[in-house]
Amino acid sequence: PITDGCRPRTKAEIRALRSYAQDLEADIVALQEVGSIAALGQVFPPSDWQLFLSQRPDSETYECRESGRQSTQQKVAFAVQNDIEVLGETDFTALGLDNPGLRHGMELTVSTPLGEMDILNVHMKSGCFEDDFSRSDSEACQTFARQAPVLDDWIEAKEREKTPYLVVGDFNHRLSSPYNKLSMLMADNSNGAKSNLVNATASLIGCHPYYPAPIDHILMGQLQSPALIS
């Protein structure tokens, strides 16, 4: 894994990533654009972490900008501390729309001091940054428009079941915008019940000088206030 990809990581970079992962002091880490379990294990040692990788079939590789190097796979993954009980894992294939070029999501069910929780890790279609994706005729937004109700259906199911849940990952979309259509869709339960969905990252601003609005988010729902505080 260290020698693969468009720009292979150096040993020093791997050490830096491993150090960063330790400094997070996180129990569960959701990742995107992971090539393999072996690559994941270089940053999250299996002696300390349970590693989970999407079962999405490998997509066709391509040459990276005439460099002579071949791309690696892009799959979602989880690293979970060994003392956390994982009760189940499911590939969320519906997000791929039966298109081999689109990423699957991945769902974990974990045991917490407050009960079971479902965590969905997503990496949605890139290239659609319109607040209202339905008003764009770009291929990216048309694809995103098909993924949006799939994600909303998953959230609505958890809302109906009153199951504590998180949705995390790379949405490739500025959900914190006040007129974002996907945010409004997810916050509106079709049965008329009040939504418990909260975007925990809504107030954050990125440090990139040209792209300050984040596209990576942490959404949560059906959590009691002690869970939010902790």
Predicted feature residues:
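Active-site-adjacent helix-turn-beta-strand microarchitecture at beta-sheet edges
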Residues: 40, 48-108
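N-terminal, active-site-proximal structural segment of metallo-dependent hydrolase catalytic domains
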Residues: 1-50, 56-68, 73, 148-152
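Active-site-proximal beta-strand/loop segments in catalytic clefts of secreted hydrolases
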Residues: 32-35, 54-57, 81-82, 90-92, ...
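Beta-strand-turn-beta hairpins that frame and shape the catalytic cleft
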Residues: 83-86, 100-131
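Acidic/histidine-rich helix-loop elements
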Residues: 1-12, 127-143
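Active-site beta-strand/loop signature of hydrolases that rely on acidic residues for catalysis
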Residues: 20-41, 79, 108, 119, ...
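Conserved beta strand-loop-helix elements of the APE1-like EEP
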Residues: 35, 67-89, 111, 210-228
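Metal-dependent phosphoester-hydrolase catalytic domains
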Residues: 98-101, 112, 153-166, 172-230
